[in-house]
């Protein structure tokens, strides 16, 4: 009987790779196969599994669409809990079941939240009186109460085909004595005529009154609520920028919170060095943000973020130019169609969201990965990047971004890496970027000139992405993006009468 009860609780989940799994039954079967009997250790395993799923953002896509990430997380868990390679398939099934469970739970919670909001909105609309304008000859207060009661009755008793019930039916069925024995006074003829007009307006809110055709019943639309959602998006994005600019989470703590450090994804020796490079580049970008005057002013400004639309455009165009440059310089050996496809993928909302998470998720205490991708995560990235370009110029701001984009491309598109030629174009190493940054700190000193769009590739303080043996005549060869970025920067700088003297808080 116990086995039958347990089997009845098993519910089917989606399939991934090897077939259909059952979340509850599969987990217990695999746990028995692994001899995972220690409850304390199992709870630790479950929490670590959810932590990795959240850090990699696996819950945003179907399990069948991210085999590599699932395999990587399974490898991490298997190595951390000291299981041999022979149990790789079992750990992959455990991760797959967890991903499917998290996706189901989030869908349910979102549906419940949406239903609750609809109920609240519906309740607000029902509380709004739908009576016509008051008249001096409407009768006594008791008669008004009777008319409102009559109106509610007509709304509730109206059939599906919206046929208007007769007034005699309403009066006979609804104007009955109350339970305590009190009776309502008879409804005056004038009130009945108003009730009839009101009921007809419920069927056609756009229809005018019989007397006074320009008077219409005011409509209350629930669809006005998305305006509040836009304000909420704006408030959340502003609060995240404030946390990042003011360094609400110290850098040492951010390193511990950094969800993108993946030491156990592979056994290759170069993995650790890549993590250090990414971490150093992120700290370099954060230090620029902390010392950026434009970022500070934006975080203190009480206006809506729409006031910084041109700054957001500057960041967006600069990021697109940076992506085009990385693809053109680092993967020039690929066919033209492949480069075009790679540029489109790197310019997608999904990739920009991952880039934004990689930079800013450890710097905020909010659930950054669960927020709206386009309206919050990518918008924060564009606003901050536009501020950095305005304060520091293109080269100093985008050089670390180019390096990060390059490594993310190799990680997400390993076939590109495997098909590379022996001497491909690629960005400077992290040490070169950091040394170049230290040599260009004087660019932010008082009295500096307005940042230019291009710099010579032969200058000593250049941080552009070049090959040692190949001269690159211009940092941004994409004329359209170059022109848009330059125009945005010129407009943004023209908002101040004098150039700022220092970049400090």
From Swiss-Prot:
**Which keywords does this chain's UniProt record carry?**
DNA-binding, Nucleus, Transcription, Transcription regulation
Positions with biased composition (Basic and acidic residues) = 1-16
Where are stretches of biased composition, namely Polar residues? 421-443
Q: What Gene Ontology terms describe where this protein resides (cellular component)?
A: cytoplasm; nucleus
Region of interest called Disordered, as start-end residue ranges on this chain: 1-23, 105-179, 421-460
- Keyword field contains Isomerase: no
- Cellular compartments annotated: Nucleus
Q: Which GO terms describe its biological process?
A: regulation of DNA-templated transcription
Does the entry feature the keyword Nucleus, yes or no? yes
Q: Where is the composition biased (Low complexity)?
A: 133-148
> Which Pfam families has this protein been placed in?
Vhr1
Q: Which GO terms describe its molecular function?
A: DNA binding
UniProt superkingdom? Eukaryota
The function of this protein is:
Transcription factor that regulates ERG9, but seems to have a more global function in transcription.
Task: Report the protein name in the record.
Answer: Transcription factor VHR2
Provide the species name: Saccharomyces cerevisiae (strain ATCC 204508 / S288c) (Baker's yeast)
Q: Encoded by which gene?
A: VHR2
């Amino acid at each position: 009987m116990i086995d039958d009860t347990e089997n009845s609780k098993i519910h089917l989940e989606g399939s991934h790779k090897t077939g259909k799994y059952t979340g509850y039954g599969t987990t217990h079967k695999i746990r028995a196969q692994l001899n995972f009997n220690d409850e304390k250790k199992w709870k630790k395993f479950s929490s670590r599994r959810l932590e990795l799923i959240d850090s990699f953002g696996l819950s945003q896509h179907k399990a069948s669409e991210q085999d590599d990430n699932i395999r990587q997380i399974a490898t991490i868990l298997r190595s951390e809990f000291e299981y041999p390679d022979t149990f790789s398939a079992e750990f992959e099934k455990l991760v797959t079941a967890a991903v499917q469970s998290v996706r189901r739970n989030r869908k349910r919670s979102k549906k419940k939240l949406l239903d609750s909001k609809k109920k609240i909105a519906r309740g607000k609309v029902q509380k709004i009186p739908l009576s016509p304008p008051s008249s001096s000859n409407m009768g006594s207060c008791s008669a008004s109460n009777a008319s409102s009661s009559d109106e509610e009755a007509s709304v509730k008793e109206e059939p599906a085909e919206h046929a208007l019930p007769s007034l005699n039916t309403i009066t006979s069925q609804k104007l009955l004595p109350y339970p305590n024995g009190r009776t309502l006074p008879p409804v005056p003829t004038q009130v009945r005529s108003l009730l009839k007009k009101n009921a007809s307006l419920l069927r056609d809110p756009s229809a005018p009154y019989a007397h006074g055709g320009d008077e219409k019943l005011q409509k209350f639309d629930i669809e006005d609520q998305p305006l509040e959602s836009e304000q909420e998006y704006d408030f959340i994005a502003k609060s995240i920028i404030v946390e990042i600019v003011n360094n609400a989470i110290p850098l040492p703590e951010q390193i511990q919170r950094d969800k993108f450090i993946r030491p156990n994804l592979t056994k290759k020796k170069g993995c650790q060095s890549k993590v250090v490079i990414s971490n150093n580049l992120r700290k370099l970008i954060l230090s620029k943000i902390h010392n950026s005057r434009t970022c500070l002013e934006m975080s203190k400004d009480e206006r809506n973020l729409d006031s910084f639309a041109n700054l957001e455009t500057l960041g967006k165009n600069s990021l697109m130019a940076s992506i085009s440059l990385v693809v053109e310089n680092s993967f020039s050996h690929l066919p033209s169609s492949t480069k075009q496809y790679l540029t489109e993928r790197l310019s997608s909302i999904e990739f920009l969201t991952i880039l934004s998470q990689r930079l800013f998720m450890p710097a905020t205490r909010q659930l950054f990965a669960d927020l709206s991708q386009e309206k919050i995560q990518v918008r924060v990235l564009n606003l901050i990047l536009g501020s950095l370009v305005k304060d520091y110029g293109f080269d100093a701001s985008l050089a670390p971004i180019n390096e990060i984009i390059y490594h993310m491309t190799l990680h997400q598109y390993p076939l590109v890496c495997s098909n590379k030629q022996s001497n491909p174009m690629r960005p400077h190493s992290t040490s070169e970027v950091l040394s170049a940054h230290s040599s260009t700190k004087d660019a932010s000193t008082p009295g500096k000139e307005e940042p230019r769009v291009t710099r010579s590739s032969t200058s000593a303080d250049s941080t552009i992405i070049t090959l040692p043996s190949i001269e690159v005549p211009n940092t941004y060869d994409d004329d359209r993006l170059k022109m848009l970025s330059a125009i945005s920067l010129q407009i943004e700088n023209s908002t101040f009468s004098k150039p700022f003297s220092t970049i400090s808080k």
